[in-house]
Design a protein with these regions (language model features):
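Active-site neighborhoods of divalent-metal-dependent phosphate/nucleic-acid chemistry enzymes
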Residues: 2-10, 79-124, 128
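Short, well-structured N-terminal submotif of metal-dependent ribonuclease cores
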Residues: 1-51, 61-71, 143, 150
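A general structural signal for well-ordered alpha-helical segments in protein cores
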Residues: 52, 56, 66-69, 88-92, ...
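Active-site-proximal, substrate-binding regions of enzyme catalytic domains
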Residues: 64-86
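Short, structured coil segments at secondary-structure junctions
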Residues: 76, 136-138
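Conserved glycosyltransferase catalytic-site signature
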Residues: 19, 53, 110-112, 130
Length: 150
């Protein structure tokens, strides 16, 4: 399988919602709760929201409540999107860059797969961790708070 071409990437096929946004939406005590809910609402009115198996799994740890999670995702008509095989090569490439820059992890982190999924599926990422994505996926369209740490 050839590495995916991102020549036509513009993030216009929808929004892949990162784990931290869903966590903030669930946690009414989070400093980011209102922002997360506002972003989910605004994004869902403009384009389809997406979640993949990695994000879904992260949201079920430590206490799985599949019914509650599915109900929340359904509120925003969130599509459960499969990881395309082509994102494997892109995630590996990004992870290689991470290792060359001194990253200590020996196996790719979930965000590498999430970023690669967004890139090959032409999705924008909604997250609080802009730097974590644009560092390794510089062409990726990212919606994040415009503050330190966002």
């Amino acid at each position: 399988m050839a590495a995916p071409s991102l020549a036509s990437y513009d993030g216009s096929a929808g929004v892949l919602v990162d784990t931290n946004i869903w966590v903030d939406c669930i946690d009414s005590e989070s400093a980011w709760h209102n922002w997360a809910v506002e972003q989910l609402q605004a994004c869902s009115e403009k384009s389809p929201l997406h979640i993949n198996l990695i994000i879904y799994t992260e949201l079920l740890v430590p206490e799985p409540d599949v019914h509650a999670l599915d109900a929340l995702l359904d509120v925003y008509d969130t599509q459960r999107s499969p990881l395309p095989w082509s994102c494997g090569a892109l995630a590996a490439k990004a992870f290689g860059l991470y290792r060359r820059r001194g990253g200590a992890r020996l196996l790719p982190l979930p965000d590498f797969f999430i970023g690669a999924h967004a890139a090959v599926a032409n999705l924008t990422v909604l997250t609080r961790d802009r730097a974590g994505y644009v560092t390794y996926f510089p062409r990726l369209a990212v919606l994040a708070p415009e503050v330190l740490g966002g």
